[in-house]
């Protein structure tokens, strides 16, 4: 791909000298300016397209330098064109000459494009060829590595599966064995706790009876003190007895006749 960089450099150098100005022909100044600007624009466009085909990883620095050179060339052409003194508008023969030069420039651009197209195709073909070669070299190694890891995993699984099953069976047996050894300890602790609880109940029984008697005595005393108050309350707030009416008194009076 370095030949492409060299070709672009030669193309830029040739483009800058394709149309030398004639100082002794001021009548052709506008014609030369137009032709030069158009040619430089076409050269820059074609060169930029060719630069874009270069690989960014390998030719990144060259691409930046060439792009900067193209920009500098365009700026130089613009500044030079603006610095030239103005001239009268060209006549009809001058316009014909400009059209002829424009046609020649377009022809040169098409020729360059035609010449670069096969080179670009060849470059693409070479790159694809190299990539295929790399893939053919690396693909067996990658497959071998994958198969090796798969084989190692299968072998490891074949070794660990029986161990896992054995451990599962041992865990079940060990749980029963542990339970057998643990139950006597649990029974001893439970018996000791039961014994201590009975001792506490025996020790607390007299105190409970005494507390019960004191509670009954206190309740009786409270009841004796509250009973007079209750009777007095009933006497104070009880409704007065009903007096019999006159009709009822006459009806209940004994008759005078025998």
UniProtKB/Swiss-Prot annotation:
It is found in: Secreted. Residues 246-258 have a biased composition (Polar residues). One of its GO terms (molecular function) is phospholipid binding. SUPFAM superfamilies: Apolipoprotein A-I (SSF58113). Keywords: Cholesterol metabolism, HDL, Lipid metabolism, Lipid transport, Repeat, Secreted, Signal, Steroid metabolism, Sterol metabolism, Transport. InterPro entries: ApoA_E, Apolipoprotein_A1/A4/E. Residues 233-258 are annotated as: Disordered. One of its GO terms (cellular component) is very-low-density lipoprotein particle. Sequence repeats lie at residues 64-85, 86-106, 107-117, 118-139, 140-161, 162-183, 184-205, 206-227, 228-238, 239-258. Its main location: secreted. Gene3D superfamilies: Apolipoprotein (1.20.120.20). Residues 64-258 are annotated as: 10 X approximate tandem repeats. Residues 32-63 are annotated as: 3 X approximate tandem repeats. One of its GO terms (biological process) is cholesterol efflux. Major protein of plasma HDL, also found in chylomicrons. Expressed in liver, intestine and muscle. Transmembrane segments: none annotated. Residues 1-18 form the signal peptide. The keyword Cytoplasm does not apply. Pfam families: Apolipoprotein. Participates in the reverse transport of cholesterol from tissues to the liver for excretion by promoting cholesterol efflux from tissues and by acting as a cofactor for the lecithin cholesterol acyltransferase (LCAT). Belongs to the apolipoprotein A1/A4/E family. This is Apolipoprotein A-I. It comes from Salmo salar.
